[in-house]
Amino acid sequence: MALPSAGEDVVRETKTPWWKGAQGEWYVVVQAVLMLLVLVGPRTLPGGPEWSLPYVPQRQMVGAILVAAGGAFFLAGLRRLGSALTPLPYPKEGASLVQTGPYSLVRHPLYSGGLFASFGCALMVSGWLTFVYVAALFVLLDIKSRQEERWLSQKFPEYAAYQRRVRKLVPFVY
């Protein structure tokens, strides 16, 4: 195997098996598990506290609005990303840096949309364990986005200016 020349994609060139996670595969697996838990996971632990929030129609409405808004933001991000879309955090070969549409509000609108929708689900089901899943998902996506941003910074010199200008996950906040 020849050594890659300057500018070549070293990770893809080495043909690392997917299960070693060289392109962030394990982030995607854990993310899928956490999102599945948010949707259909247990709401409390066996023998644990039976805590759940009392039914409040306003909380249900806020949850539904967050699910709809998060889903719409996610879909807008998918659409804007277009052919650069990949399930992995490693940037797709030949992709360009997208900074318009939802990407002008946050650097990771797919993650943001998923988080807002997940928090909305937690509000609607009111089980304490669902809030734990959402918190774990937030931590995972924050860590995943840091790795993704290292790769994006290597691929796109203009990414540093974009980072200074646009928040990571929550518009105008974080």
Placement of each model-derived feature along the sequence:
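Membrane-anchoring alpha-helices and their flanking helix-loop junctions
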Residues: 1-99, 116-174
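Solvent-exposed interhelical
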Residues: 95-105, 110-111
